[in-house]
Amino acid sequence: LIPAHAAEKKSAMIECTPTDEKLVFDCMVMLTGKKSGEVIADAEFTVGADMPSMPMAHNVEPVPAHSVGNGMYHARITLEMHGEWALKLEFTKPERDLVVSKLVFSKASVSPSDGHDHKHEHKKNKD
């Protein structure tokens, strides 16, 4: 028998936090089925990263994610610099799949990427 979620696309909620080591982040991944919302507890995957603004120039060797229970997985990644990174989750179990999530990594925090440059300010015209 094949589990109901086996052929279902995966949804990954990723939270990364800076460690005491420069450019090293602890990432927690919560996996669920995209449609069913069911926890995926038996996945095997690696976490790698590419910098979308500089394709092929900056990428991180994938590291294995380790299950900590209830559909939660941990991976520690080391980046080359701060900025926007596309985290790539490459699955081998329950089936081959790829999930990509863009995050902005800074010295103090990690936040989801919304495609906007957060370094500029909007100026309002005063009439």
Located regions from the model:
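N-terminal soluble domains immediately following signal/targeting peptides that reside
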Residues: 5-127
